[in-house]
Amino acid sequence: MADGHIFSLFGAQLTARASGLLWWAHRRILCVSDLHLGKADRLARRSGVMSPPYEITDTLLRLEAEIDALGPAIVICLGDSFDDLAAAKSLDNVEVQWLYRLQSGRQWIWIEGNHDPGPVEFAGQHLAEFRDGPLVFRHISQKSAEAEVSGHYHPKARVQVRNRSVTRPCFLYDDKRVILPAFGTFTGGMRSDAPVLKDIMQRQAFAVLTGEACHVIPMPQE
């Protein structure tokens, strides 16, 4: 499916969008993980590495397009929304006002991540985790949890397409949880066959590769 792959998690019908966002149509909840806004600023500040300065603009443009298309009542940012707390303060006035426009008229929830482990100076609720209906939303998956939506690992998977190998950010899901891909620009990724992901996910898990269209495969585990 071009726009997304629909699956069920504890009775909630969810759509893994080709963009990398998760959409719960029944509750009009849009969920995004690992924006890492201000990553270029952090890299320059900590290591002197200069990255192209457009990462915030690119990330917000793609997020805005999804919000305009779906009209969510609730947006949940699953942690690591900013690359660190200093990066949250590095956004210029245009970028700050852009975020405020995206937040306007809807509930906005910032889940704390390991890169931004405390409240940031933006409107919205700042929570360690959030529950709605059967689902719990948090940054890092807990192996014993069920009905869980999380991020953190930036999963990616590889598939053979027309005799060549293609690697894409991906959702990972089984009958207990879904892990979202990173949405931010310059975020990199962890292969789905990494030991930590194989330990969290069940053997019958699936990967939903993102990009121009979704491509669903059994989660690569070797």
Question: What do these predicted ranges mean?
Answer:
Residues 1-222:
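Extended recognition/assembly regions associated with phosphoester-bond processing machinery
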